[in-house]
Design a protein with these regions (language model features):
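The substrate-binding groove and active-site-proximal loops of carbohydrate-active enzymes
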Residues: 22-33, 59-74, 118-137, 198-214, ...
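Catalytic domains of carbohydrate-active enzymes, especially glycoside hydrolases
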Residues: 35-62, 142-150, 259-260, 319-332, ...
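Short, acidic/polar
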Residues: 30-46, 130-143, 245-251, 313-324
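Active-site-adjacent "subsite" loops/lids of carbohydrate-active enzymes
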Residues: 90-146, 161, 183-210
Length: 666
């Protein structure tokens, strides 16, 4: 089974000339070589047109006195900024650490209270300690006195360092005073590990965590405001700490500034493109869907880590940024583009690709603004019933194994993530976990439209009593079968039995489009049906439901094949009543579609190492024109023709390359 793994600020921080897509590029901390870093920043602006550079300062306490490190680091930023005097480069700061990303290892430390985690380990310094609190104030005061163009905090401002924090004496005293309890740290850890979300002790500890993080950011902002309240700020969120992040972004923003938040959407070491990218694409889409209308400007995490071509190629770097702009994010945080690490220049390939495409991202952001999504609708959740602050069980906006990651991208089928289930669209439920997070009302609303339901989700729906609306009863049985028969195409599909087979019993009025069955050998005329496998049903709510035995947990050889893709597309055609738009290629491919003013805007990304010589699409529509967005931001005409039921475009697509096409209808 494949592992699943996509801004223009207010006037107070009008950061970048590019419309609606701002790059926050990080520059290497370069003590003694600030002139080199500044020269790099000037060249970066000249070549790419992006003017904002954040000088990276790792400011969590180290050494004794810890403030000495801060003085030296801030002085280095001052030299960097001075080297840029007279240049249009806007010198900002990335506070790469203030609490610290991971447990401490240095010897010379301040006598401040350490955080204690859920395993009883001493980890970082606790912000409740007066000494450390003053350190935070002093640090941001010194930063503000340099009047940076922007201050971005990093994702070390989080409520865990491997494990949940904080059970230090200061937090325990505060907790017990508020709750009127006398817990020891060990007793509270044990209590919380077994507690549910509505437990009063759980809620009280959760509030302390939020206050701990909020206190750090509010203290930082207060220190900045005491010096220069016009300095804009933003935050980076840690992966799956989304229950904390929005208040932090708002607290870090200057008065009148739109909050800025870098999302947790990185894809660092890209060794397994087809496995890692679908998860990343889906996360970007889900972040944008979840925070749409929140008033927060979202940045994707386009970091190259460890900041070289062993991590990420320049092509994939641009593809990552393209995905972010297409899904509607407002910009990206990038690392060390056109910078140095010590005496070694970071590959200028990253600079080259931005220079060659300096008009591309702003034009894309403008093109998708105000557009509507098309494609299968994957649920984006706003409830997190299984999220637990102590056991480290995290839930994201979309469930792992969802249809977007595991089925749509491998087959080049467009999808979207959605929070509301009232709209007339085709929904996709792939996992039991998705069904568990949906209320009965949510499910009824979905089932009054069009829905494709994969095996595990079908079983969960049957257990919830929705057989009358799906047209399928699902039971576990020991079935005898060795294949699936696709009656739409008259072919057999790979499908092996297991200890967890499901028997589908279809409503008599349902249409069975494929079956599980037994054939003694390939080509044998005998075929004994064991269960329906693809069932199409029109229910009493006016909905149409396609329920299938196919599911994301199957082995790859069963999940992905030309025959399997043809079966799914034909079944979706029957569900929707029209030809399903999709890639015309039998290979891994991101295909996302937005519609605007009679045009389709299509993002395609080739995730297969097999290059595509001519892009093609399975489409129900004829088109008047086809255009491709060029690096300079212009739309170039593409020769296209219909051939064998596909729209064939005379434009290639290399491995991990992205293309944005615009189809104008006749």
């Amino acid at each position: 089974m494949r592992e699943s793994m996509t801004c223009v600020l207010a006037a107070v921080c009008a950061l970048n000339a590019v419309a609606d897509f701002t790059l926050y590029n990080v520059a290497q901390f370069s003590p003694g070589n600030e002139n080199v870093a500044a020269a790099d920043a000037k060249e970066y602006l000249e070549r790419t047109g992006n003017d904002l550079v954040l000088y990276s300062l790792t400011l969590h306490p180290e050494g004794r006195p810890a403030i000495e490190k801060v003085r030296r680091y801030v002085a280095s930023f001052g030299k960097f900024k001075a080297e840029l005097a007279g240049s249009p480069v806007r010198a900002g700061i990335l506070v790469q650490a203030i609490l610290g990303h991971w447990p401490r290892v240095d010897k010379d430390i301040e006598d401040w209270t350490r955080t204690i985690d859920a395993k009883g380990n001493k980890v970082r310094f606790c912000p409740l300690d007066p000494g450390f609190a003053q350190y935070i104030t002093d640090t941001f005061t010194m930063l503000a006195k340099e009047h940076p163009a922007f201050i971005l905090t990093d994702d070390d401002i989080r409520a865990f360092s491997h494990e949940a924090e904080c059970f230090c004496p200061l937090h325990m005293d505060l907790f017990n005073k508020r709750r009127g309890t006398s817990y020891t740290a060990d007793a509270l850890r044990k209590k919380l590990a077994a507690a549910k979300q509505d437990d009063p002790d759980y809620l009280a500890f959760f509030a302390l965590q939020r206050e701990m993080l909020g206190g750090v950011v509010k203290r930082a902002r207060a220190a900045i405001d005491a010096v220069d309240p016009s300095i804009p700020g933003g935050t980076c969120i840690a992966s799956e700490e989304h229950l904390f992040c929005a208040p932090l972004a708002r607290a870090m923003a200057a008065r009148g500034q739109t909050p800025v938040m870098r999302t947790a959407t990185a894809s660092y070491m890209e060794r397994m493109t087809a496995a890692g990218v679908p998860r990343c694409v889906c996360r970007m889409m889900a972040f944008e869907e979840y925070y749409r209308g929140s008033g927060i400007e979202l940045l994707c995490e386009a970091d190259t880590w460890p900041h070289n071509l062993w991590s990420k190629s320049s092509r994939s770097f641009l593809t990552h940024l393209t995905t972010a702009a297409f899904v509607g994010m407002n910009g990206a945080k990038t690392w060390y583009v056109n910078s140095h690490k010590g005496p070694f220049a970071v590959s200028r390939s990253y600079t080259d690709v931005l220079a060659e495409n300096r008009g591309f991202l702003p034009a894309l952001a403008e093109a998708v603004a105000g557009s509507a999504w098309e494609g299968l609708a994957v649920p984006c959740f706003t409830n997190f019933p299984g999220w637990h602050l102590v056991t480290n069980h995290r839930e994201f906006f979309v469930e792992s194994g969802n249809a977007g990651e595991t089925i749509c991208i491998p087959f080049g089928i467009p999808f979207q993530t959605v929070r509301d289930f009232d709209a007339d669209r085709t929904y996709a439920l792939a996992t039991a976990a998705e069904v568990a997070r949906l209320s009965d009302g949510d499910l009824r609303r979905m089932l009054s439209h069009k829905v494709v339901v994969f095996r595990d989700a079908a079983e969960a729906l049957s257990k919830r009593g929705f057989d009358a609306l799906t047209g399928v009863k699902v039971e576990r049985r020991n079935l005898v079968f060795n294949r699936e028969r696709d009656d739409m195409h008259g072919v057999d599909l790979a499908f092996s039995p297991s200890s967890k087979d499901r028997l589908f019993t279809a409503n008599p009025s349902a249409e069975v489009l494929s079956t599980l069955g037994y054939r003694p050998f390939a080509g044998a005329p005998q075929y004994d049906v064991a269960s329906p496998a693809t069932v199409l049903f029109a229910n009493a709510l006016g909905g149409r439901v396609l329920t299938v035995q196919y599911h994301p947990k199957m082995e790859n050889y069963q999940l992905y094949s030309e025959a399997r893709r043809a079966w799914l597309l034909a079944a979706l055609d029957r569900l929707s009543g029209e030809k399903t738009f999709a890639s015309g290629h039998d290979q891994d491919m991101v295909v996302l579609v937005r519609r605007k003013a009679g045009e389709q805007i299509v993002l395609v990304e080739n995730l297969s190492s097999e290059p595509i010589r001519r892009l093609s699409f399975r489409t129900p529509s004829a088109y008047r024109t086809v255009q491709r967005l060029a690096g300079d931001g212009s739309w170039k005409a593409v020769d296209a023709r219909f051939d064998d039921g596909k729209l064939v475009c005379e434009t290639p697509l290399a491995f991990y390359e992205a293309a944005v096409l615009r189809f104008a209808s006749k």
